Amino acid sequence: MIEISEKRLIGPIIRLHPNDNIVVARVDVGIGEVVPSENFTSRSQVPAGYKIAAKKITKGEPILKYNVTVGFANTDIEAGTMVHSHNTEFREFDRDYAYASEYKPTDLLPESERATFQGYVRANGKVGTRNFIGILSTVNCSATVVNKIAEWFTPERLKDFPNIDGVVAFSHGIGCGMEMSGEPMQLLRRTMAGYAQHPNLAAALIIGLGCERNQLKGLMEQEALQENSTLHTFIMQETGGTRKTIEAGIEAVKALLPEANKAKRQTVSASHLCVGLQCGGSDGFSSITANPALGAAIDILSRHGGAGILSETPEIYGVEHTLTRRAASKAIGEKLIQRIRWWKDEYSVGRDVQINGQVSPGNQIGGLANIFEKSLGSSMKGGTGPLMEVYRYAEPVTAKGFVFMDTPGFDPVSATGQIAGGANLIAFTTGRGSMFGSKPAPCIKLATNTPMYERLTEDMDINCGEILDGTVSVQEMGQRIFELFLRTASGEASKSELLGLGDYEFVPWQIGVMS
């Protein structure tokens, strides 16, 4: 398990673990600057968030951050020298998975002591944090229709229905030209069904063209969906075309509004919270501030009986052994490694993607040398508790505590899978500055550093840069984030909601051949 210090940060550099051969610059460090706490003089101009060799690192020696290997020196590196992609080699190394060897069950709070929020209790017992009506397209050919229906329901037309958060379209770019059987179609249908049945939707329409490969009948049968008072379907070729389907859809939603508006928030346990964990535009401070603080919040949520979904499989690669050791069983740990091997040995072979080493330009500018270092920070969002289950993309999440879902690293695709799996809240950390938002699950964004937070304050919900500023500890920030979970779940608007984001972020994983 990666150990996170509970001390507040002070001084120009940060030592993350006694065994590390690097430290991290908390502020810009100039050439010739003496660092008394580490007994070296800086040989480089080192930007804040970048690594500095704390002692001589010989060629081929592992570079240790949090006592975890994040690369290898490709040359001799003298103490005080900046350590980054120019002198760090990315290569494979043996990792001991030690399945379930560090498993410790979560110390659950008694139900009477658990936190609460104000949520929408659905007929099936699930709890929503928002109250939307959703309109889904089976295929891109019906995308315009579902969007036109949703656009008709302006705030003015919904003013008599104050308990409804809106009518939202979930259109996408696939549904035809793809394999009719196998994983690609199963995955798309699983994603659509997860949205259609999401607790943040009071009701849903599903609209198809009629001749697409993702046939409406096949979708309904595969996912055991049935038309009822809160789920209606239309086929454009049978309804009379574009205009008539839009009109029929509008009338169908109008009929759903009165019942949907009857939904009232009521006090429910925090155990009904399921938080999808995301990071984007990561930087050198992600593993020091926002990610471990979010992890601390998930540890708290887990004690209250809730769930946190870590995802983005390429962004745990290289540190997956720190998760398998915490798995509740060997079988759960092996599920995680099976997904890693699929990515490495089948899906990404020979491709210029980040699981093969190269991170994005923004990550590199932010101080991250390679995918191992990025993964180190990314994995921290899940906290320090046991890994309770591993899910395929968009599978329904039923386990409580810290779980993992196999998704790509691209944020909209990953969050779509999490929401389809049941996430009713998204928590998103960023160092460079992400503008992501989602529906029907609200998204809160956590800044890793104060300068970015102040520059993008309209988009950021909480400033984890205060950890770096030395005013709060990781654990204290984790408690703040947990409290923000509860307020947001109870209806407090996130920054992304205030900006109207989330209408274009439904992006199912397009995994197969397109022809």
Predicted regions and their residues:
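Metallocofactor- and cofactor-centric catalytic cores in central/energy metabolism, strongly enriched
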Residues: I2-L425, S434, P440-S515
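Short secondary-structure boundary segments
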Residues: T430
